[in-house]
Every structure is written in C-alpha cells, then in structure tokens.
C-alpha cells in the first residue's frame, strides 16, 4: 500500500548479475590477453564487447522488460567504470535497464534490505544465492529465468 492506494497485486521486480548470468568472460588465451590489455587501458566498451552472451537469460531479460513490463536491474561486481559499457552492451541486445556497480556481493546483500520484499535476484552460483538469501535464484546460462 502506498499513499492509500490499495493494489490487488504487488509489483514484481527482478535483478540479475551481469557476470555469470547474462554473459561469460573472455575464454581462451588470446582473448584473455586482449581482455587484460583492454582492462589496463581502461577501454571498458572493448572489454565488455569480448564477453560471450548467454542466449536464454538474455531472452528472459528482454521478455521481462519489453513484454511483461517487469522492472529489472542489472548488477555487476566488475571494476568501477564498466556500467556504461554494460548499458550499451545491453542496448545492442535490445533492452534498456539500469546498471549498478558494486564492489562485491556483500554490498549487494546490504542494498537488498531497501528493495521490495517481492524482488528476485538471479545469480550465477549457489554460494551467491546462499549469501543473498531467499530472494536469490541460481540462473542457468542454458535456461530461462523462473520467478
């Protein structure tokens, strides 16, 4: 209830981690060397462009935002400054959502206290899910998201 406006259903909101949920870091020796050079030179757009997208989670993200109208936020624990590059990467995939950078998963856990209780966050590993609690769901790179 907000401002005496009673709704039949609570707005659903989702969040997901960029790394491990929406994309995989560069693999292979040559790609890793190029990625390391891009990081050293702070060329974040080039670095994020080297990441391999996970098709099913990206389709789930696009569907959630564009068809269902569900608000989604993307979180990253990569180095500061990559938010704009991730935002552009997502825009090229067909979705515009807010991207937030955190130093580590513990900061995300602290931030979750201020979000809606119905919010779900999709993470890459079981350890991250255990840390974030009941709101977290481990997302497979080969399957759709489940609310």
Model features per residue range: what roles?
Residues 2-102:
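Alpha-helical substrate-recognition element adjacent to the catalytic core
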Residues 68, 79-147:
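C-terminal cap/substrate-recognition subdomain and adjoining C-terminal extension
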């Amino acid at each position: 209830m907000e401002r005496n406006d009673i709704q039949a259903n609570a707005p659903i909101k989702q969040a997901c981690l960029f790394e491990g949920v929406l994309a995989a870091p560069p693999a292979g020796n040559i790609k890793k060397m190029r990625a390391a050079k891009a990081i050293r030179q702070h060329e974040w757009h080039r670095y994020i462009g080297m990441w391999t997208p996970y098709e099913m989670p990206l389709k789930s993200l696009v569907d959630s935002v564009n068809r269902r109208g569900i608000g989604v936020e993307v979180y990253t624990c990569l180095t500061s400054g990559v938010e704009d590059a991730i935002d552009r990467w997502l825009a090229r995939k067909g979705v515009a959502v807010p991207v937030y950078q955190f130093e580590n998963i513990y900061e995300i856990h602290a931030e979750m206290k201020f979000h809606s209780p119905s919010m779900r966050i999709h993470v890459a590993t079981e350890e991250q899910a255990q840390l974030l609690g009941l709101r977290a769901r481990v997302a497979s790179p080969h399957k759709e998201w489940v609310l």
